[in-house]
Each structure stands twice: as structure tokens, then as C-alpha cells.
Amino acid sequence: MHTLGDIAKTINAKLVGDSNVEITGVASSLYANQTQLTYIINSKYKQTLIHSKAGVVILNKDLLRICPTNALVVDNVYLAFAKATHLFKKQNVCYQGIHPSAKINNAKIAPNCIIGRNVSIGNHCIIASNVVIEDNVTIGNYALIQPNVSILQGCSIGDNIVISPGVVIGSEGFGNAQDQQKHWHSIAHLGYVVIGNNVSIGANTTIDRGTIEDTQIHNGVRIDNLVHIAHNVIIEQDSAIAATVTIGGSCKLGKRCMVGGGATITSHVNLADDIIITGASTVDKNLSEQGHYTGFTSISKHQKWKKIQVWLLNLDKIVHYLNIKLKKLKEK
């Protein structure tokens, strides 16, 4: 918990409001309450600002006149937000072995595991050797967690989970802000990873925690080896992700989606339910209609892509034909 006066000093902001107000955490601009801090990056979100119930908003001076609550006025909003997040970052306490506060039911724990404070592990779980489970993690029943897995602070795992060797759940997301000298400042990721029931996660997959809200993997999802899932991603029920797929930050995949091996989904892309992505494709825009999509430069409907591929393979013949036609026209 920090007062607005303390926060203003930390981020070098002009405080407009009560310096004694206490702030307990950070939330998105849509959901922040009177004890939480949020930020508004530009005038695109002015309607959100007008209706904000946040305890304080980081913003620039142009938006101050419509701010209904306490304000921290800065020139570089994103940089100030990045600095503010570190005030609310919970530090994991390193501990050797199993912390006495951990609640472990009928589970088998192999040697060399580290289990932190206030961890809860359900019935009939198997925790293999060299697994690290940090503070405040919750694991349901019948989980199989294989060697060298790391489940980091505050994450939640459902029932009937299989987590293969080398998986990292809850790693810090790739969020950074630049100052005037183009130096980078990291954003502390305050969200968690929440994984539902009946999920399988392949070896050496990494799932980043959310920036403010949680990264979510819903019931029945299947994830292959070497997949990277960035911060704030939501993967809905019964979707399947093949090996070496990269899913950028803040993407949302609908129910029953299938993503082929080696595909890339760039940040802030939404996929509707029942979408199939061909392996090695690059998805760089929202797909709102179910179907099979393929594309290695820009994504398109699969049937259209097949026609384009035929044209590309015969492009030299088409050019040769057109040159002959052009020559004949010139001779007339």
C-alpha cells in the first residue's frame, strides 16, 4: 500500500488531488476501483477516463480537465506507469524444500523440489524432481507435474493437468517503456496465469503472466512442445496449439481453434471460434469468421491462398505469355 504522495515522488509526477489517499494496487482503466491506480495513454480512451472509478489516474495534462478523480500528471504516461508498477510487485521469498505453510494433500513429492509459502496442492498429484512452485500457487487434483517445471508466484492450476518437463508458467512478460534517452524500463507484471481443468502442456513451453489482468488457458486446451504464450493471452476451451507456435501479447483465441506448428500470431489479434491456422502461417489481423486460414506473408482464407499459390508457382509462365502478347500488339 502506498500513498499518492509517495507514488507521485517515485514517478516524478504532478499530483492533482489528495496526497494521503492510499493505493493498494494497479488495474486496467475499465476495472480500477477507488483503491487502485490506472493510466490513460491518450484521448482515444477519454470516455473510459470520464467514467473512471479509479483512486488515481496517470495521464498527460491535456486530459486533466476531464479526469473525475485524483490525477498524476506526467509527460510520458507509459513510462510513469512502468515505474509505478514496481511499487506493487510482490517479491517471492526463496525457500529451500517445502515451506511449512504449504497445504499438501494426498500428493507425491519427489526429491529436490521447492514449494513456497501458502502453496496449495490437491489430492493425488505427482510432483517430479526439481520442480519449483513459488509462493501462493494453487494446484488442483490429479495433476502430473514432470521434472524441472517452474510455476511462479500466484499462478493457479486446475484439475487433471499434465505439465511436461521444462515448462515455465508465470514468467515475466515482455513489457517495457522508453524514456527520452531511449533507455528501456521494465513493467512489473502484476497479473498471474490461470489454467483450467484437463489441460496438457508440452515440454519447454513458456506462458507469461499478465501485465495487470491474468493470462488465461481455459478447460481442455492442448499445448505442444516449445510454444510461447505471451502476457494477457486468453485461449478458450478445447483449442489446440502445435509445437513452436508463438502467440503475441493480448491475443484471444476462441473455442476449438487449432494452430499448426510454427505459426505466429502477432500481438492484439482475436480469433473467432473454430478457426484452423495452417502450420508456419503468420496471423497479423483479427479473424472473425470460422474457417481454415493460411498465409506466410499476410493471412487469407485458405481457398483463396491456394489460388494465389498456383499463380505464384506459374508466375514465370504468365509473364512469358504476357510478353508474347505485348510483342504482338506492338508489331501491329
UniProtKB/Swiss-Prot annotation:
GO BP field: lipid A biosynthetic process
A Pfam family of this chain: Hexapep
Gene Ontology, cellular component aspect: membrane
Keyword Lipid metabolism: yes
EC number: 2.3.1.191
Annotated pathway: Bacterial outer membrane biogenesis; LPS lipid A biosynthesis
Keywords: Acyltransferase, Lipid A biosynthesis, Lipid biosynthesis, Lipid metabolism, Repeat, Transferase
GO molecular function, one term: N-acyltransferase activity
Transmembrane parts of this sequence: none
Catalytic residues of the enzyme: 231 (proton acceptor)
Reactions catalysed according to its record: a UDP-3-O-[(3R)-3-hydroxyacyl]-alpha-D-glucosamine + a (3R)-hydroxyacyl-[ACP] = a UDP-2-N,3-O-bis[(3R)-3-hydroxyacyl]-alpha-D-glucosamine + holo-[ACP] + H(+)
Stored PANTHER family: UDP-3-O-ACYLGLUCOSAMINE N-ACYLTRANSFERASE, UDP-3-O-ACYLGLUCOSAMINE N-ACYLTRANSFERASE 1, MITOCHONDRIAL-RELATED
Family: Belongs to the transferase hexapeptide repeat family. LpxD subfamily.
Role noted for this protein: Catalyzes the N-acylation of UDP-3-O-acylglucosamine using 3-hydroxyacyl-ACP as the acyl donor. Is involved in the biosynthesis of lipid A, a phosphorylated glycolipid that anchors the lipopolysaccharide to the outer membrane of the cell.
Quaternary structure and interacting proteins, as annotated: Homotrimer.
Protein name: UDP-3-O-acylglucosamine N-acyltransferase
Source taxonomy: Bacteria, Pseudomonadati, Pseudomonadota, Gammaproteobacteria, Candidatus Pseudothioglobaceae
